[in-house]
């Protein structure tokens, strides 16, 4: 939406490229998560977050867990509670458990965009008073998806290549919503698929896609490098000239 706003303001040249990681822009193709998007349920949810001022991160994580209860709920209930075994040492699970609150205003905006599928039509949404038209976003884009993603089906992520106005490079990685992203080089099981162009039909793209062994991260680094400025020496010290508000990671971590 920010990119469309900049395009409307004639300032899109401030951005060299855009990246969309496991992101759904067309909510008519949102997959299993769309089962939660009926009018009554979402209005009740936004009213609760409005009263509190935020959507609790643990509550949001619980909603997503119930989309895959066998894997994300009962599996651990049997292992940890019934069998008394310790949870597996898995870095992604640890990271996934570190939830973050969402402000009530942002929660409401997300709901409005999703319910009305506002990003698929020019002017369906506004950004700082500017009608949003994704077709005016003409910078190159790098769009990634996970072949086993239950939250953002890869076909839904692929749809973004048709909504944006610039040239897109679509990458289909192994694994699901999180593991397709947290996919560093060195895993012998990792592969990704890529093709030279992005036809309208995702099945047509898949039929012509080439399978590449390894992580997609090096491909992404190359793509970014081709659209970035000249390399400069790294600063000797961290930080900038702005006033420090608090020590990292911030005061929010102490809220209960």
Whereabouts are the PLM-identified features?
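Alpha/beta-hydrolase-fold enzymes
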Residues: 3-107, 225-256
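Mobile cap/lid helix-loop segments that gate and shape the active-site cleft of serine hydrolases
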Residues: 96-132, 139-140
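Hydrophobic, well-ordered secondary-structure elements that form the walls
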Residues: 111, 160, 220
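Short beta-strand/loop motif that positions the catalytic acidic residue
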Residues: 137, 143-145, 149
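Acidic catalytic loop of the alpha/beta-hydrolase fold
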Residues: 148-152, 177-179
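Short alpha-helix in the alpha/beta-hydrolase fold that links the catalytic acid
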Residues: 153-163, 174
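Catalytic active-site module of serine/aspartate enzymes centered on a nucleophile-bearing elbow/loop
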Residues: 169-256
